Amino acid sequence: ELAAFEGKDEALVFSTGFSVNAGVLSVVVGRGDYVICDDRDHASIVDGRRLSFATQLRYKHNDMEDLERVLQRLPQEAVKLIVVDGVFSMEGDLANLPAIVELKHKYNCSIMVDEAHGLGVFGRQGRGVCDYFGLTDEVDLIMGTFSKSLASIGGFIAGDKDTINYLRHTCRTYIFSASNAPAATAAALEALHILEQEPERLEQLWKVTNYALKRFREEGFEIGDTESPIIPLYVRDIEKTFVVTKLAYEAGVFINPVIPPACAPQDTLVRFALMATHTEEQVERGVQALTKIFKAQGIIK
């Protein structure tokens, strides 16, 4: 069902999303190959590429000119894999997948997209960023997790039949790790059915997301280039990030502090993440509480 949902031949299920990236990348590329990553890719991608023994190259976040500069230096006939988050987990912005696909054809590359934060949010019935851009067939491997929109634990990789069969017999994090718990798998499967059968949930998610984006911008928050229900509220001070988180919790607002190593010291933020079950009234209460806190801390005027 996962493979069909993602528009691929087959899929493998892992016990965690982290183990998907760490395991898959360690075996789909190797010595003499090249793996090219956005410098804001998830830590599991970083660990996977290190384990692969391939030459690791990075480009500036969502900078397609820099990606092309990296690709221009590589042999045309070499194995080259571009690995990118579909939605970046801290910033909330999207990978420029149309431009990456153009470069794939120009420089003879393959593409792997991490849909951890795109699944259940973008595309038809929440199929992800690849579907949102209409580029599912151009992406060679699609990775996803059960721990975000599917409200469980686990992960998967979807692709063509031969590649998935190869991974089934070579991927160490799949072979030498316990299978996902039946209850967790069943919960994720039921969540997938809800995505397919209850489109009004996705509509509500985007309704409250667009409302929150508008209100935070009106109040003068720095939220960067987010295009998703992940809304970063930049603090740019480690100590104040913790203070804001504590004060927000006391005010009845749950936010996640993001500090090194998840970001650079000058880029600390709190992450305001939305669900389909939130209402505009709840969002407004959150915006008002955070506006008061951020102003008291001198973060916004």
Where are these regions (language model features)?
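Active-site phosphate-binding strand-loop segment of PLP-dependent enzymes
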Residues: 57, 61-113
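Short loop-beta-helix segment that forms the pyridoxal 5′-phosphate
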Residues: 1-23
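Helix C-cap/helix->beta junction micro-motif
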Residues: 52, 106-107, 219, 251, ...
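PLP-dependent enzyme catalytic core of the Aspartate aminotransferase-like
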Residues: 4, 250-253, 262-301
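Conserved PLP-binding catalytic core of the aspartate aminotransferase-like
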Residues: 203-211, 217-252, 262, 266-267, ...
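Active-site C-terminal subdomain of aminotransferase-like
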Residues: 107-110, 117, 122-227
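Conserved PLP-anchoring active-site segment centered on the Schiff-base-forming lysine
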Residues: 24-43
